[in-house]
A protein has these predicted regions:
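Short helix-capping segments at alpha-helix termini
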Residues: 78-84, 117
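Acidic, Mg2+-coordinating phosphoryl-transfer loop and its flanking beta/alpha structural elements
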Residues: 125-148
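Conserved hydrophobic residues forming the short capping helix/wall of the S-adenosyl-L-methionine
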Residues: 74-79, 113
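Substrate-recognition element of Asp-dependent hydrolases with the DxDx(T/V) motif
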Residues: 34, 38-74, 84-97, 136
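Conserved Lys-Pro-Asp/Glu-containing loop-to-beta segment of HAD-superfamily phosphomonoesterases
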Residues: 100-133
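Alpha-helix N-cap and loop-to-helix initiation/capping positions
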Residues: 25-29, 62-69, 103-104
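Active-site neighborhood of HAD-like aspartate-dependent phosphohydrolases
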Residues: 1-49
Length: 148
């Protein structure tokens, strides 16, 4: 039986963020300690799920194939530490697209709830920005801020 669920943002939590976006595999660089922390959660039988805004897709900076390659690099790096990501949920829209899935709107978290058939009340959501915290609060999740 799984111990629980932890939702994490990607950029700025697992890997270093960039104002120029993470557009390629080479630009994805893990933050020291992040992979080990996720591996500890995995070994404790937590499901770890990523919820991330990826507006670089809408902006034409990278495509789905590149995003998948970046996520494959992340999964491989996590596997080498004994960790795993159980699912990745992302919003590909830009800030002016008025979608429901771009954080701080809670659509991405509702998708996690529906697809994984879980309740989100009290579930930790680890993020590095006010957007993440507001998103967590909108669904009753437990917002956890990391300063990287």
């Amino acid at each position: 039986m799984k111990a629980g669920l932890v939702i994490v943002d990607r950029d700025g939590v697992i890997n270093f963020d960039s104002d120029a976006y993470i557009k390629s595999v080479s630009e994805w660089v893990a933050i020291p300690g992040s992979l080990e922390a996720i591996a500890r959660l995995s070994r404790a039988d937590y499901r770890v799920v990523v919820a991330t805004n990826q507006s670089g897709i809408a902006r034409g900076l990278y495509d789905m194939e590149m995003l998948n390659r970046i996520h494959q690099k992340m999964a491989k790096a996590l596997g080498e530490q004994g960790g795993r990501i159980d699912a990745i949920f992302f919003c590909p829209h830009g800030p002016d697209d008025n979608c429901d899935c771009r954080k701080p709107k809670p659509g991405l978290l509702h998708e996690i709830k529906d697809r994984l058939k879980v309740e989100l009340a009290g579930v930790p959501l680890v993020g590095d920005s006010l957007l993440d915290l507001e998103c967590a609060e909108a669904v009753g999740a437990l917002p956890i801020l990391v300063r990287t």
